[in-house]
Amino acid sequence: MLIDWILKNIMDMDQEDQSGKTQWTKYYLTVYFSGLFNLLMILILSVLFGTLSETFIVYVVLIFLRPVAGGWHAKTKWLCRLESIVIYVAIPFVLKNSSVSLPFIYKILLMCLLVVLFYWYAPQGTAIEPVQPSDLNVLKKQSLIRVCLLILCSLFVKEKIASVILYGLVIQGLMILPVTKNLIEGSVFMKFGKKIIKNVIEKRVAKVSDGVGTKPRLNQNSPNIFGQWMGQTEKPKKNIEK
């Protein structure tokens, strides 16, 4: 594995070492290369689907807002990649090839709604990246300033570009809403997937044990098959040794 090779040959760290420093280094390398892979994947797909400019605008909007507004993250690499494809390529492709446009009055209402949304929910911290109370007001002000700047920009550019900017604002707004947390993180899909796998296994076990005796039940403490298959990467606890 590339990360293990880097730890051993470049960072001069033992990959079997369970100390905090090694685990944190491995975690951040995993995040870095996962992000790099996603970026290359999005770039290639945007070129293939002819959405390079739209994808770039959405990317700039989210990069501009996310550091101060925060927001939910997908819990698995595969879900993150799927959401990235939808957000950066699929929907921009639809916007580019659609002739439908919002009337100006609806755009103004949407802009006002976005300002209220960011005022109310930004910054949105997570368990991995919590917002410190001392930073709350500063980040909220920065979020509102950046949202207002993007809204002003959308008023002085071509309609197609303005639509993409507003779309990026809407996406970032959805990422900080409490009601979208389970959807974006993938908890809904994980729960649904585990239920399907459990039902399938129970049916197969029931067929095998049919006529033999009492129908066996799955152990409630059995490993999380679905979570392991998805390959979720957990952030190590803060136990770095000085």
From Swiss-Prot:
GO biological process per UniProt: proteolysis; quorum sensing
Transmembrane annotation, as ranges: 29-49, 52-72, 78-95, 100-120, 160-180
GO terms, molecular function: peptidase activity
Membrane-protein topology: Multi-pass membrane protein
InterPro entries reported for this sequence: AgrB
Residues of the signal peptide: none
Alphabetic keyword roster: Cell membrane, Hydrolase, Membrane, Protease, Quorum sensing, Transmembrane, Transmembrane helix, Virulence
Function description: May be involved in the proteolytic processing of a quorum sensing system signal molecule precursor required for the regulation of the virulence genes for gelatinase (gelE) and a serine protease (sprE).
Family: Belongs to the AgrB family.
Annotated protein name in UniProt: Protein FsrB
Lineage: Bacteria, Bacillati, Bacillota, Bacilli, Lactobacillales
